[in-house]
Amino acid sequence: TTVGWKGLINDPYLDESYRIEEGLRLARQVLMEINRVGMPAGSEFLDVISPQYIADLISWGAIGARTTESQVHRELASGLSAPIGFKNGTDGNIKIATDAIQAAGRPHHFLSVHKNGQVSVVETKGNKDCHVILRGGKEPNYEAKFVQAACSELEAAKLPASLMVDLSHANSSKKHERQIVVADDIAKQIESGSHQIFGVMVESHL
């Protein structure tokens, strides 16, 4: 979104008090409880500083449509010890996601914050476990023809031809109840023998 609630870390009490220091503690507490019961946790990485506080508790991460093209987020992904999904652009552009995967797969050197809080030069090894998330653009892109087209782009970029589909956002026309319709289509693609979709992203309140 252009403006709006940025999440638990940024504004933990949803009252525009922006008590980020408390949000970081709450986020770690929630993630530790989730990990304690043996459930893997995922998170979207909005900025490049907060991951230092939570990345050890994250099993999978996402880079949003508006930040997939950001060089600093690609560098961040190159150093994270978890699979990272890059969403296609808000206009439906897949190439920015394939470019991001290629960039994140390579080593990088950049300024960041060390675990002790000091500004440091960071060297990453590259993250080969990155993938595309289809989230729709000017129109939904979850149907088989769009999945096939995206996988063809991945193959052309010499990347694995498999991806994740976001049931929400532009794929549901921002109507949460339409996620069921999208999920039904994805299930039929898999039932018909497609191996191109390995997972889905669902928006809900658990």
Where are these regions (language model features)?
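A structural signal for short secondary-structure junctions
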Residues: G126, A157-L159, S192-H195
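Redox- and metal-dependent alpha/beta enzyme cores, enriched for Fe-S-associated oxidoreductases
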Residues: A150-K158
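Conserved, mostly hydrophobic/aromatic
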Residues: V165
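C-terminal hydrophobic structural anchor segments
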Residues: Q179-L206
